[in-house]
C-alpha cells in the first residue's frame, strides 16, 4: 500500500510557498532564470499554457525527461501538471519525486466525472477553483493548495480577479452563517459541510490560495496580492514576454512589495512588451479552460 502524507504535513509544505511566485518553465535554462529571479518554485511542463492553447489537440502530462531535467537544474521545489482525474499520471510524477502535483485544467481532462483522490498520495496537490464550491470539493479530496483558475494562456487577469473576489466573498458569507444556514449553503454549493464548518471556525480557507491564470505584469501580481492571494503563479506571462529575466525579477519583487507603488512603478519601467494576450470575451465556451473540472 502506498504511503500517504498527512493533511497537516502536506498543507504545511504548501504554506512554505506563501508570499512567493511560482513560474512555469519548459527546460533547465528557464528553470535557472526563474530560480535566479527569486521564484519559490517552478512548474515543469513541455509547453506553457499559451502554446497549449495555440496548438489545440490533447494536452497530457509532460515527458518525464523534461521534468527530471528541471529537477536536476534547480534547488527550489518542482511542480508538474497532470490531467484532471488521471491518477496514473500522478503516480508517475510521484515516483519521479516531484515536490507538488497540479491537477490542472490546462491539460485535457482524462475523467469527466471524478477528480483524483489526492488523500491517497504522499505528494501534496494543488488544484484550481473559481468559487467556494469548487474550493471545498478539492479540499475534501485532499488538495493541499488552491489557485484561481483564471483563464490560462491569455495574459488577461480579469478571470483571476473574478475568481479571487468570488471565493473571498463567499468565505465572508459562510463565516457569518448559523449552523442551519451552513447546511443549506453546503447543499447549494455542492460542498462538504465539514469543510464549510472548518472555514467558518478559522475564518478562511484551511489551505493557501494562490492567484493564477492571466498574470502578465508586475502590476497584475500586486493586484492579486491586494485581493487576498497568498502568492502568484505565472504561466505564459514571463517567457512569452520580450525580456523574461526582467519580467521574472519584477514580478517577484512586486509580489513581495505589493503595497509599495513607487517600487512597482520603477519595476514596470523598460521591461519591454508583455505577452500579447487574448481578450477572454472573444473565446468560445469550448475554448475556456476554466470550465474544465467540476
Curated annotation (Swiss-Prot):
Its EC number is 4.3.3.6. Signal peptide: none annotated. It catalyses: aldehydo-D-ribose 5-phosphate + D-glyceraldehyde 3-phosphate + L-glutamine = pyridoxal 5'-phosphate + L-glutamate + phosphate + 3 H2O + H(+). Keywords: Lyase, Pyridoxal phosphate, Schiff base. It is an enzyme of class 4 (lyase). PROSITE patterns: PDXS_SNZ_1 (PS01235), PDXS_SNZ_2 (PS51129). InterPro entries: Aldolase_TIM (IPR013785), PdxS/SNZ (IPR001852), PdxS/SNZ_N (IPR033755), RibuloseP-bd_barrel (IPR011060). Pfam families: SOR_SNZ. D-ribose 5-phosphate binds at residues 24, 153, 214, 235-236. In the presence of PdxT, forms a dodecamer of heterodimers. Catalyzes the formation of pyridoxal 5'-phosphate from ribose 5-phosphate (RBP), glyceraldehyde 3-phosphate (G3P) and ammonia. The ammonia is provided by the PdxT subunit. Can also use ribulose 5-phosphate and dihydroxyacetone phosphate as substrates, resulting from enzyme-catalyzed isomerization of RBP and G3P, respectively. PANTHER family: PYRIDOXAL 5'-PHOSPHATE SYNTHASE SUBUNIT SNZ1-RELATED. This is Pyridoxal 5'-phosphate synthase subunit PdxS.
